[in-house]
Every structure is written in C-alpha cells, then in structure tokens.
C-alpha cells in the first residue's frame, strides 16, 4: 500500500482513465480491483495526479450489489482514505462519454494515461475486445477511435486483459500513442501465481513505483528520474514468467521519452566513444560526423549512453555495409571505394 498524503497542489496537465469491466459476478475476481487500486495509488501518491482528473470505471459502478466472485461488492474506495473513487459502471456508453469529455477538455499540453484490466475476448474474425459489465464486449475497432479523437500531448495505454495485443494495430496511425499489452491478439493473459494481481500489470506498476537502493525506480534503467513507457514495458516483460508474450508499440520513439511524470527532454550532452579510439563530444541536438578515408575498410562499433536515442544516416560515399539503428547501438563496416569519402552521421534526437 502507498503512504497516504495530502497535497496542496497537483499536476494540472495529467489525466487518467482506469477501466475494469469484470464481466459478471462469477468471474469478476478480486485481483482486478487490486490491479486498479495499485495503479490508482501510484498515480496519486507517486506521480502527483489530481483525483479529480482520474476517472475510474469498474464493474457495476457505485452499486452496492454483489459484483465479485467472492460474494461481496467491490469497495468504492481504492486508496483507503475514506473517499469513494469508483465513479461509473463499466458500460460502453460510460466509456464513450468519458473519452468524449476528455476530447473536449484536453489540449496539446496535457497527458492521458489509460489502464485496462479484467477479461478480454477474441472472436472468429480475429477481433479483440475488452469485456465490460454484463458481459458486454467493447471491440478495439470501437474503443480506438474514441481515444484517437483526444488531442493530448501524449497518450500512454497499458492493457492487461486477455487478447489485448489486438488493440495495438488500431493506434499505429496515431503518433501520440504509446501502448503496452500483456499478450498478443490471440493469446490469454495470466494472473500471478498467488492470484492477487495480474502478472504483466503488476510488474508494469512495480517498474514505475518501487524504488531500488539507488533511490531511482526499479524500471528507470538509465536513472534519469523518468521511468519511460518503454522502460516500464521492458521491466514488466522481462519479469513476466507466465505463458504470455507482452507487446508494445509507439511511433517515432515516443515511448523512450514518455513517462507518468511527463516527457523527458530529448536533449542531453556527453561523450560518444568509438571502437577505433576516437572520441566525439556532443551536446544537445548537435550532429556528429566522421569521415572514413578512401580505400580503407574500417569496422566501427559505437556504444552510446542508454538514455539517448539516436538517428543514423550515411550522408555521402559508398559504404560496403552500413547498419543503421534507432536504438542505442549501431555498427558500420565501411569499404570505401568511391571517389569521395564516406560520411556517417549520428544525431542525438
């Protein structure tokens, strides 16, 4: 559990939607509530979200009827502070209305985090859906346009339901979306062995919440105080031991910069080391060039600090083999036989 805090101010440009459909009382397992409670507290007490900016849509909403497999009603208070946090029943109409309101409210300065959990389906036509209350199916083809209509600076989506990977393709034309899922489009997802949480979302949440001895979050590999969507996904994927294959997508390397506490800067400074022995200093968005002499084959292996993303380009000449990568490493085998030198460019993005 999180340490409850009372804050005078919150980050006004952060919004979140938490959805757990549940299906029906016989299959609405308590772990779904646990998953939602954990991420809800993380947003409030670790990342300074305003509770007024978090919409929680869960099973039968505020009803006191039995809605869980344990024969009780889901507690409405997710963080133990005495205030009800669950607002709406998990119906497609409530979800549509929530996203429509956000589309009217959010601007290009705002961030949106979307978290979904419980059951999912995969039909004979290969369509994935999120199971809502009363076993209603919300298909990816319906869900995605509601989200894509929101003009936020960036949208970070984490999905833990079965067959969640089927939602990814519907966001590939939106450069503002990063999406991580617990499984592929035709694969179930799994709970943890003790049944208290779901495997993938548990470790995703741990990546952005649990502190290592260094003082940084365990998922913050480069220790820059931003556990990015990609770092959190990678941490969850490597710790996930169940029979599921987590998936991830974002365009233009968005997930390397997007985190729950905002967007880390795309500029930095440091040193680029080259295997041949040269060292190139760079600062911010500066472009680094080096020239391969004529008729002198050179095998260059370059390794950068892991907190930077690089774009590569062979700007002139005729390399025998140029391996380009937008990750943190790249190699060049330059067999120069052209009449002009080969110039390879690495640019910190």
Write out the residue ranges for each language-model feature.
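Active-site-proximal C-terminal subdomain of hydrolase catalytic domains
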Residues: 37, 155-251
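Short, compositionally biased P/S/T/A/G/V-rich stretches that sit at domain boundaries
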Residues: 262-291, 319-322
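Boundary/activation segment at the start of structured domains
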Residues: 1-110, 264
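Low-complexity "stalk/linker" and mucin-like segments enriched in Ser/Thr/Pro/Ala/Gly
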Residues: 307-327
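Acidic, glycine-anchored loop motifs typical of Ca2+
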Residues: 28, 32, 68-86, 128, ...
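Solvent-exposed segments in extracellular or luminal domains encompassing
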Residues: 328-342
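Solvent-exposed loop/turn segments at secondary-structure junctions
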Residues: 22-26, 60-64, 118-124, 135-137, ...
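A short, glycine/acidic-enriched catalytic loop
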Residues: 73, 77-83, 87-90, 105-107, ...
């Amino acid at each position: 559990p999180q340490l409850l805090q009372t804050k005078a101010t919150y980050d006004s440009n952060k919004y979140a939607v938490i959805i757990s459909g549940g299906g029906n009382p016989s299959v609405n397992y308590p772990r779904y509530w646990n998953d939602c409670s954990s991420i809800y507290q993380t947003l409030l007490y670790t990342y300074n979200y305003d509770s007024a900016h978090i919409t929680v849509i869960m099973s039968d909403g505020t009803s006191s009827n039995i809605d869980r497999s344990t024969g009780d009603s889901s507690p409405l208070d997710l963080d133990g502070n005495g205030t009800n946090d669950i607002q709406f029943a998990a119906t497609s109409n409530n979800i549509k209305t929530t996203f429509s309101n956000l589309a009217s409210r959010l601007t290009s300065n705002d961030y949106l985090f979307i978290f979904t959990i419980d059951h999912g389906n995969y039909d004979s036509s290969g369509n994935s859906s999120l199971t809502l209350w009363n076993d209603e199916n919300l298909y990816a083809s319906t869900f995605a346009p509601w989200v894509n209509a929101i003009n936020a600076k960036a949208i970070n989506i984490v999905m833990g339901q079965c067959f969640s990977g089927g939602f990814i393709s519907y966001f590939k034309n939106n450069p503002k979306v990063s999406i991580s899922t617990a499984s592929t489009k035709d694969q179930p997802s799994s709970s943890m062995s003790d049944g208290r949480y779901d495997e993938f979302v548990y470790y995703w949440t741990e990546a952005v919440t649990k502190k290592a001895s260094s003082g940084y979050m365990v998922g913050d590999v480069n220790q820059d105080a931003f556990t990015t969507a990609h770092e959190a996904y990678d941490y969850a994927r490597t710790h996930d031991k169940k029979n599921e294959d987590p998936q991830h997508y974002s365009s233009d390397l968005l997930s390397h910069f997007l985190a729950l506490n905002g967007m880390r800067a795309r500029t930095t400074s440091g040193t680029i080391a080259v295997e041949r022995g040269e060292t190139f200093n760079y600062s911010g968005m500066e472009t680094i060039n080096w020239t391969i002499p004529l008729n002198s084959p050179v095998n260059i292996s370059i390794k950068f600090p892991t907190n930077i993303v690089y774009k590569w380009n062979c700007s002139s000449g005729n390399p025998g083999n140029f391996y380009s990568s937008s990750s943190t490493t790249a190699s060049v085998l330059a067999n120069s036989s052209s009449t002009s030198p080969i110039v390879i460019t690495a640019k910190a993005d």
